[in-house]
Amino acid sequence: MGDLGGEEVTLDDLVEREGIHYKKFTDVPFTGKVTGQEQGTFKNGKKEGPWVDYWSSGRLREKGDYKNGQKDGSWESYDPKGQLRSKETFENGEKEGPWVFYWDNGQLLDKGDYKNGKREGL
């Protein structure tokens, strides 16, 4: 993915209206980079490409990709101590494919498969 250009802001500099993000006091959908606790890129007011979110401690909280404002592909989430909590897969914002959840000690808690946002095999 090439550089989308635009400016660099924090999420606090943006407002969301009907699923589209705008820089405060403007009517133009935001295109540019977001820095701070949550980091990634907006294209035409929607999250696009790789995003990361950090706990206030600076440890990684969540990482994955967005496509046209929707979670898409593999996502991982972590607890405040940095322990992996889940591996999830999305397609167009819906749960799709394998999901795995872990206990605080790293042991497997649960796993399953999703299709069209619904868990299969239940």
Could you describe each region identified by the protein language model?
Residues M1-L122:
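Glycine/tyrosine- and acidic-biased, solvent-exposed loop/turn segments at the edges of beta-strands
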